[in-house]
């Protein structure tokens, strides 16, 4: 099980990133006291996204997070309503996919269901 992933972004993008991940079902949680400065944590179903505040963040051009969403069309609508870039993608393993850009430029794949374990 993946416990967390960390992504770098400028401090100015943190509030919008929290809004973005909240629309994907994450909630903000408090990091340990030693990590309060410079980090913002979000969690959904035991998996965390750690937003690491950085003056010069690194955004890998092809790397991405993949998030399963119960209602892909509703998720895309919510993202658009809040001004986030998101577009439908190709179907894989019998389920639709979409792609969004999180604040800070990180790519996020949205999946209607995960691929089978053997994929």
Question: What residue spans do the PLM features occupy?
Answer:
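N-terminal beta-strand motif that seeds the catalytic metal site of vicinal oxygen chelate
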Residues: 1-18, 63-65, 114-119
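Short hydrophobic/aromatic beta-strand micro-patches
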Residues: 8, 66-70, 101
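Core segments of cupin and vicinal oxygen chelate
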Residues: 8-48
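Structural preference for long, well-ordered alpha-helical segments within the folded cores
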Residues: 19-23, 78, 104
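Short acidic/glycine-enriched loop/turn segments that link adjacent beta-strands
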Residues: 34-38, 59, 92-96
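Short hydrophobic/aromatic beta-strand element in the GNAT-like acyltransferase core
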Residues: 39, 48, 66, 97-99
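Mid-chain, well-packed structural core segment of small domains
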Residues: 62-84
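Vicinal oxygen chelate
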Residues: 82-119
